Amino acid sequence: MDVGIFGGTFDPVHQGHLKSALAVKEALGLDQIVIMPNRMPYYKDRVGTSDADRLAMLKLATQDLNGVKISTWELEKTTYSYTFDNMVALTKEQPQNRLVFIMGTDSFLKLHTWYRGLELLSVTNIAVMKRPQNLSTAALDKANFLAELPAPLQPLFKQALSSNHHLSASTGELFMIDNPETDISSTELRHLLTQKRYVEATNFMDPKVISYIKDHELYSA
């Protein structure tokens, strides 16, 4: 089975997250997307919503989506771990599956600064959700895209970029996927929710999630 691994804090989950996940699933013909809420990264100094609340909101937001599964794999870990180590572990646990790690353009452009980031393709495939505001070029305009990459990423990009949206290997393939435009971020949504501007937030979030937030008084000032 071909499976996309989509990690994040999802604090809160919004339509941009879901549209992005489904865009990758459709573009690569994946059998399943596994949304994996993670522990709050060590570099985030903000006190986030509880794991239980983030998980509950994800379940509400995805309950009607076919081929989308929520995994608590990372939340169940007792310590924070690096993406490279996580993908090694997941690959060992799922030898029958071909995994694709899904990431945004902003994260990909910093991949060389991650722990063993330049080695990530040796243990998995990568799908980069190309955001129009980040890159001015078309998804597969290789020459122009290459010029915008940090130097450490250029050899990786040259070697791994797939010329089509067809998964053909267990590791080593890099895909650039056009990402539906999203007009809001989780940070901006938290600002709306803190001000109890729920009607505006409903433009970007599942109403069931909004109801959960109101009922549990999340993101209150």
Question: Positions of the model-derived regions?
Answer:
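Nucleotidyltransferase catalytic core that binds NTPs
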Residues: M1-A221
